[in-house]
Amino acid sequence: STFVNADCFDVFPFIEDKSIDAIIADLPYGTTQNKWDSILPLNKLWKEYKRILKDSGCVVLFAQTPFDKVLGCSNLDWLKYEWIWDKKLGSGSLNVKKMPLKRHENILVFSKGKTTYNPQMTKGKFRNKSTSKPSSNKGNYGEITHQKDNFNDDYYPTTILEFTNANVRARVHPTEKQLSLMEYLVKTYTNEGDTVLDNTMGSGTTNLACIKLNRK
């Protein structure tokens, strides 16, 4: 894993075309007065992302309202879906009498086409696992015939990710994400040996996840 302390737009020219398997980054949201929290020029950013990303790659970006709306609209052609990260603890106590505490953030997933997706299964209670085949009668998905197959305790992920936010006192960066959350995203969207880019490194949590999971 390589760390570069520089303006990402100064570094992009040194990254080869179609050399990146996934971009996983926590961009500035532009919601605070901090100097580092300035929204990057998104048109310029997408130009570089599209150049360096492999055709089978994906872009996974953290966001929060209102920035998530701006970010999604910046590349609607590539926008596929979003995760909701439930941080378990709310923030924004100074505004508690004007608005609800912010307990979640959005994670937007973009791709040009089919991309790597390794669903992280969880264990739950045993249930009947059914298989289904569309018939020749066409509805939204065709007429579905369910056939009970066997008992299974593997559950596919939903769009809600539950990870407690990083310990405030131990943070290196104000917007630091939990290592376990970054590992989840790296495992979901890449395979061992893949190359991952985080162009807004912060505390380097994405890099740590990649080192631990044998990604470059």
Q: Predicted segments — roles?
A:
Residues 1-216:
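Core catalytic lobe of class I
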